[in-house]
């Protein structure tokens, strides 16, 4: 039988006393009362803060959104299938944040900034809050630099500036996403970081966009944040804020960014679902009362920063889908009132073969010509005026059979101008190409052509100027002015190309 030695026991006790750590760990915990539909009701969590992250014992993370007298309403960032009634929950003391770094460029991630493209983890040393305050009045400066989309109809008549928020609105299948992706493609070589946020889209649609960007080398400067239609409502609600946080990271590092939200109405639907399940009182169209704030705090983060902050910018292009052209629905009117203008795409124009199907009459940019270079201002004014007169005359001409020669000429010119606004998808034009196209149309050089020949002639003219008159593009890009020298070069090119074209025909 082993002998018990008193000195050994006293040594062990002394050692334990010396090693005793007095540190008291206070954990704010609670118990799950009920779980389902992506919502959990928690008893306890007395000191939890609004928007704080909470962790369930099986690892799921949630956000405390409803703080009530007897329980806390938590939305889950996952399916929560393993959460049971009675399981414990602890408050983390943190609010939602994501890692950020240059390594995210070229990747496809989810709302929690986790990669979903199967290309491994993304390294980052910094993190950023998903929801951060928008720059104040003193931190901003007015928009003055153009953000070229490569689409004549937009760059000439509805110009977008760096730091602007321009809504793209229209029915389904009218080419809204195509306008946005063309804008991304046109940023190649312009040192603009692009973020495309897909909210509640079909996974196949997102894959199509990613493939289109990869094929044309645009993923090098693009980040895609995607939460598909089968994602939990919480993640669809968070995705735009994740995209904004990534764009802000680059903006505050003196870079220019472009962010596309496709589309915020799906985010509003996800937020409505969460709010109704949390038993918040419904308002118009069953949306909660703060749905305007949902979008305003997101879109206000787009800005052109002051010179003290490095003059970085974040340009936002939210895309909103309307139901049979109803722009006066709740979400469209909300977003229209927050943004600095809208580009309206019409199903009728799209079906008539006018693509991009931009209705120039009701589209507007509240920044206007401040976001255009001088050369574009010189030629775009005449185009706007002539198209407006043409639209008026066309409506009038439907009721009248005998029109005088001047009216017939004006209608013929208008039809050719409308033709020059047509562009194939994924074929953006440089500013110089746009200027020569508009100048050719507004100065009557297309009047002698059949409407069917206009696009072919313009394509050949652009190639001709690029190869035979490279000085034209050099003058426009260096001086940003449509000088007399550039005008003379262009006139010569048009005459020479016209002769060649007529010989071919």
UniProtKB/Swiss-Prot annotation:
Q: Does the keyword Chloroplast apply?
A: yes
Residues annotated as binding ATP are: 170-177
InterPro entries associated with the record: ATP_synth_asu-like_sf, ATP_synth_asu_C, ATP_synth_asu_C_sf, ATP_synth_F1_a_nt-bd_dom, ATP_synth_F1_asu, ATPase_a/bsu_AS, ATPase_F1/V1/A1_a/bsu_N, ATPase_F1/V1/A1_a/bsu_N_sf
Question: Can you state which reaction this protein catalyses?
Answer: ATP + H2O + 4 H(+)(in) = ADP + phosphate + 5 H(+)(out)
Q: Which GO terms describe its cellular component?
A: chloroplast thylakoid membrane; proton-transporting ATP synthase complex
Enzyme kind, highest EC tier: translocase
Q: Where is the protein found, in the record's own terms?
A: Plastid, Chloroplast thylakoid membrane
The EC number of this protein is: 7.1.2.2
Q: Where are the transmembrane segments?
A: none
Q: How does it sit in the membrane?
A: Peripheral membrane protein
What superkingdom heads the lineage? Eukaryota
| Site positions for Required for activity | 363
Mention one GO molecular function: ADP binding
Pfam families per record: ATP-synt_ab (PF00006), ATP-synt_ab_C (PF00306), ATP-synt_ab_N (PF02874)
The protein's predominant localisation is plastid
- Subunit relationships: F-type ATPases have 2 components, CF(1) - the catalytic core - and CF(0) - the membrane proton channel. CF(1) has five subunits: alpha(3), beta(3), gamma(1), delta(1), epsilon(1). CF(0) has four main subunits: a, b, b' and c.
What family does the entry list? Answer: Belongs to the ATPase alpha/beta chains family.
Q: What job does the chain carry out?
A: Produces ATP from ADP in the presence of a proton gradient across the membrane. The alpha chain is a regulatory subunit.
> What protein is this chain from?
ATP synthase subunit alpha, chloroplastic
Q: Whose protein is this, by species?
A: Oenothera argillicola (Appalachian evening primrose)
Q: What is the lineage of its organism?
A: Eukaryota, Viridiplantae, Streptophyta, Embryophyta, Tracheophyta
């Amino acid at each position: 039988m082993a002998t018990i030695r008193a000195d050994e026991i006293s040594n062990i006790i002394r050692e334990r006393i010396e090693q005793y750590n007095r540190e008291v760990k206070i954990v704010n915990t609670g118990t799950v009362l009920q779980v389902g539909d992506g919502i959990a009701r928690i008893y306890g969590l007395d000191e939890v803060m609004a928007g704080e992250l909470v962790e369930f014992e099986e690892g799921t993370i949630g956000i405390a959104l409803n703080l009530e007298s007897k329980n806390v309403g938590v939305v889950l960032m996952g399916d929560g299938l393993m959460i049971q009634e009675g399981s414990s929950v602890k408050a983390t003391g943190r609010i939602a944040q994501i890692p950020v770094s240059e390594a995210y460029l070229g990747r496809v991630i989810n709302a929690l900034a986790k990669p979903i493209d199967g290309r491994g983890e993304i390294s980052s040393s910094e993190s950023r809050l998903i929801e951060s305050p928008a720059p104040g009045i003193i931190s901003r400066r007015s928009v003055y630099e153009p953000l070229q989309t490569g689409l004549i109809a937009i760059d000439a008549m509805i110009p977008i500036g760096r730091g602007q928020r321009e809504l793209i609105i229209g029915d389904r299948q009218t080419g809204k996403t195509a306008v946005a992706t063309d804008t991304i493609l046109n940023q190649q070589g312009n040192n603009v970081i692009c973020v495309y946020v897909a909210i509640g889209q079909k996974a196949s649609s997102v894959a199509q966009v990613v493939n289109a960007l990869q094929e044309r080398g645009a993923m090098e400067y693009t980040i895609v944040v995607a939460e598909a239609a089968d994602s939990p409502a919480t993640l669809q609600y968070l995705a735009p804020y994740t995209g904004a946080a990534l764009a802000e990271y680059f903006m505050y590092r003196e870079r220019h960014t472009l962010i596309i939200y496709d589309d915020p109405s799906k985010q509003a639907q996800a937020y409505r679902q969460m709010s109704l399940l949390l038993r918040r009182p419904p308002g118009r169209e069953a949306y909660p009362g703060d749905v305007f704030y949902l979008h305003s705090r997101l879109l206000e983060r787009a800005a052109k920063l002051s010179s003290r902050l490095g003059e970085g910018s974040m340009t936002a292009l939210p895309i909103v889908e309307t139901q049979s052209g109803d722009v006066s629905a709740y979400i469209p009117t909300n977003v229209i009132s927050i943004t600095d203008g809208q580009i309206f795409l019409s199903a009728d124009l799209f079906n008539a073969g006018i693509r991009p199907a931009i209705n120039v009459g009701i589209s507007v940019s509240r920044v206007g010509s401040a976001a255009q270079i001088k050369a574009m201002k010189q030629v775009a004014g005449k185009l706007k005026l002539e198209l407006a007169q043409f639209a008026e005359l066309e409506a009038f001409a439907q009721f009248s059979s005998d029109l005088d020669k001047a009216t017939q000429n004006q209608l013929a010119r208008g039809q050719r101008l409308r033709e020059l606004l047509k562009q194939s998808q994924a074929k953006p034009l440089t500013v110089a190409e746009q200027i020569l196209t508009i100048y050719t149309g507004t100065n009557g050089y297309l009047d002698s052509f059949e409407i069917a020949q206009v696009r072919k002639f313009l394509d050949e003219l652009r190639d001709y100027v690029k190869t035979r008159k490279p000085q034209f593009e050099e003058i426009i890009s260096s001086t940003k002015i449509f000088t007399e020298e550039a005008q003379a070069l262009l006139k010569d090119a048009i005459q020479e190309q016209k002769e060649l074209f007529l010989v071919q025909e």
